[in-house]
Amino acid sequence: MTTSAPTEKLPLYRSLYFQVVCAVIAGVALGYFYPSVGESMKPLGDGFIKLIKMMIAPIIFCTVVVGIAGMEDMKKVGKTGGLALLYFEVVSTFALIIGLLLVNLFQPGAGMNIDAATLDTKSIAAYTGPGKMVSTTDFILNVIPTAFVDAFAKGEILQVLLLAILFGFALHRFGGRGTLVFDMIEKSSHVLFTIVGFIMKVAPIGAFGAMAFTIGKYGVGSLFSLGKLMGAFYLTCLIFIFGVLGAIARIHGFSVWKFIKYIKEELLIVLGTSSSESVLPRMMEKMENLGAKKTTVGLVIPTGYSFNLDGTSIYLTMAAVFIAQATNTPMTLMQEITLLGVLLLTSKGAAGVTGSGFIVLAATLSAVGTVPVAGLALILGIDRFMSEARALTNLIGNGVATLVVAKWTNELDMERLQAGLNNETWEEAQEPERVLDKKTEHMPVSAMSDAG
């Protein structure tokens, strides 16, 4: 394997990891000591997330088009997509089951003795109103954009992915005649990633604003009011990450702990912003740096943001059973299995919908009919603090899924993977945008003519 000469590490103060840690600590301090000022910092976090979101659609489009158009065997695209969906279904089912088992073991809602009739349901009306849950048919139809530009304007990931797949297939059919378009799209992707590199420079500001707002608005005290559920949920996420995902990673030849260290900067940004989308472009590039082929990365990561929400799956089963425990609503084994079965369907049907956690939970509780929907009011206040664990688990789960599916399809360079996880490719691991210019000089210009 050919490796580049080792590069000098950045000084600690210039490390994005260090900057985000300091920003999060400063945000917590500001929100705690000056709550009103902390609340006013919300635009900083919102602005950073919007900056990243504006780049997601074009990056996914360029990455997937280049990956598909440059492939010699089109059957691999279908195989990759099929294996990814199979993996998503199996692992997210494991997440639901683990959440169900551990919430029964920890019993976080036992002893609260809440009368559901006394709960104020006004606060959850926005999540439980008619038409909030998207049907399977509507979900499938929503994947098809009304216009080509509309998908990009609205930032609909699955719609952009569909357009990219179709465009990539069509460009592949052109063979050598499409080389000019292929080269233009590929070079555009490098420009887009360079822009993401610029945006990431302000990630500490975004993390600071989001954390200051959260602590300022909700207060540290609200962390303790329903701390037992939060503690059980965070512990369950850790068990899932190091137990289930750790075992999957080990079977496929890499360490989940080393992988977490590799994406530590992205995890900190997600911790600050509570949005796994805030690092989607950077995660795609980092997966490529680990040796996963562009096609696999472009298909698995965007799809995983809709179908592989492991942290959300754990949250759904734990929250539903917690409400039952808190309101003294007995649930038989059959009723819990029914709850699990309904969640297998509803957790996919609301993918990509704002507030999907509450919407899915409300729809599921209504469908099962055993647990009072009014109990959602119990967890509304701490949901914001559990969103970090959901987003972090989702991010790690999608990263592991990408590497696993890439290995299944022989699209993973294991030597490059081990080098990246062992910090042998330090520059690419920690500052991927710094090597974009070097990569631009080695773009596969002949890929299109070979495909033809």
Swiss-Prot record:
SUPFAM superfamilies reported for this sequence: Proton glutamate symport protein
A GO molecular-function descriptor: malate:proton symporter activity
Keywords: Cell inner membrane, Cell membrane, Membrane, Symport, Transmembrane, Transmembrane helix, Transport
A family per Pfam: SDF
Coiled coil: none
Stretches for region Disordered: 426-452
Main location: membrane
Transmembrane segments: 18-38, 51-71, 83-103, 151-171, 191-211, 229-249, 304-324, 337-357, 359-379
Compositional bias of kind Basic and acidic residues: 431-442
Record GO biological process: L-aspartate transmembrane transport
Membrane topology (UniProt): Multi-pass membrane protein
Domain of life: Bacteria
Gene Ontology CC: plasma membrane
Known function: Responsible for the transport of dicarboxylates such as succinate, fumarate, and malate from the periplasm across the membrane.
Protein family according to the UniProt entry: Belongs to the dicarboxylate/amino acid:cation symporter (DAACS) (TC 2.A.23) family.
HAMAP family for this protein: C4_dicarb_transport
NCBIfam families cross-referenced by the UniProt entry: PRK01663.1 (NF002461), PRK13027.1 (NF009587)
Protein name: C4-dicarboxylate transport protein 1
Source organism of the structure: Polaromonas naphthalenivorans (strain CJ2)
Gene name as annotated: dctA1
